[in-house]
Amino acid sequence: MENILNDINKRFISLPEEDVRGNKQILESVLRTFVEQMKTQDPLFKALFRRVFYGGSFYDGLKVGKPEEFDLDILLHIPIYAQPVLNESNVPGFVWLKLNNLDGWLRQPEGRVYKDFRKKFLADNDFLDTGKTLRWMESLVQKTLNTLPWVNNATCELTNEFGTFHINWWKGGPAMTLGISHSSGEKIMDVDLVACFVFSGDKWPINGYRSNPFPSTKPEFFIVPKKPQGPVNPQGRYWSLSFQEQERVLIDNKNRLKPAVKLIKKLKEKTHPNIASYYIKTVFLHIIEQKDQSFWNKSLREVFMTTLREYNEFIADQSIPYYWCRKNNLIGHLAPITLNNISNRIGYIIKDIENNPENIAKHLLTKEEYTKYIQGEDVMAEALPALPASQTSSCVII
């Protein structure tokens, strides 16, 4: 079974390093160009902008399959003079942010560039509003795209040191999505851009939340304009907390952890796609607390089977507590019968591969993939087309 798991990981889950590097270079070069153009379109954005955080499963090392989808956070910073105050809301995992000295901030000489902040970002009583933030971000992305040459009514063109790319866009959830293609029309990737606000450790939530495990090296966290499950009022006041930088350190340097996560994600894609990938990552964050470092150095078979059983225990209990605030049950919105069915399905798979380890491939792979597996095809080696010659030069991103 060990050989089968390693083979599946190599041929159906993990991309060759050169393909990963190529898409990463294209992404970062296009985003660098696009963000610089965004700064020219809105002085307020230029003043607020701190950095881009390259988040999501690709940069965590947990991506399954082709690197065609990326999650990027556009981190914005509110000056301390405005006295931003974060308060835990009545929904675990969500906070409210209020500016207690907005007018004093705006009266400062350097505050002039922020004169439209209230109109564009704040609701009643100077609370930061998710709806206004999303609309501002949508408008800014549209305005930036309009500065680029248009190929047709839906596609514009961006040129940088890696070549010429076609970009279109659409809106989904809290993200603005950029679709990036080669000028030939061949799709490269979709990039979700989310405007977030970043805060330092002195604003870290306290009541019911874990303390920062890396206060000196990773002191910052984000708030994201994502609404809670279920009805809340006022809707625009709720911001989701994000501790992605700390999570990345927690899962790093644990030998078999990332391959095991990717195998379970591969299984969920086939058998229970209604469980979000982040929930699986959260389960592993809880498991990390219970295991010492030596556990992750065991065989992939043992780590995979152990973590799969523990993952199924969370599903059977119908609760995956948010790692940073246990009161927030990440799967609380799913129907009990749905979770029972998922747990029973995973339980059957566990028993089957315990009795017949060679059956693991049938459970992890689709019918088409299994046929290719039997035929010995290396699917991931052919997952991405080669870059055009003009984009395979020795350009270095500075």
From Swiss-Prot:
Keyword list, A-Z: Antiviral defense, ATP-binding, GTP-binding, Immunity, Innate immunity, Magnesium, Manganese, Metal-binding, Nucleotide-binding, Nucleotidyltransferase, RNA-binding, Transferase
Binding annotation for ATP: 57, 69-71, 244-247, 265, 277-281
Binding-site list for Mn(2+): 288-289, 292
Record Pfam families: Mab-21, Mab-21_C
Catalyzed chemical reaction(s): GTP + ATP = 2',3'-cGAMP + 2 diphosphate; GTP + ATP = pppGp(2'-5')A + diphosphate; pppGp(2'-5')A = 2',3'-cGAMP + diphosphate
Coiled-coil segments: none
Protein origin, superkingdom: Eukaryota
Cofactor: Mg(2+); Mn(2+)
SMART domains documented for this protein: Mab-21
A molecular-function term among this protein's GO annotations: ATP binding
Biological process annotations from GO: defense response to virus; immune response involved in response to exogenous dsRNA; innate immune response
Binding-site positions, Mg(2+): 69, 71, 192
Enzyme Commission code: 2.7.7.86
Positions bound to GTP: 192, 240-247
Stored InterPro entries: Mab-21-like_nuc_Trfase, Mab-21_HhH/H2TH-like, MAB21L/cGLR
Activity control note: The enzyme activity is specifically activated by double-stranded RNA (dsRNA).
Similarity remark: Belongs to the mab-21 family.
Role description: Nucleotidyltransferase that catalyzes the formation of cyclic GMP-AMP (2',3'-cGAMP) from ATP and GTP and plays a key role in innate immunity. Acts as a key sensor of double-stranded RNA (dsRNA), the presence of dsRNA in the cytoplasm being a danger signal that triggers the immune responses. Directly binds dsRNA, activating the nucleotidyltransferase activity, leading to synthesis of 2',3'-cGAMP, a second messenger that binds to and activates Sting, thereby triggering the antiviral immune response via activation of the NF-kappa-B transcription factor Rel (Relish).
Protein name from the UniProt record: Cyclic GMP-AMP synthase-like receptor
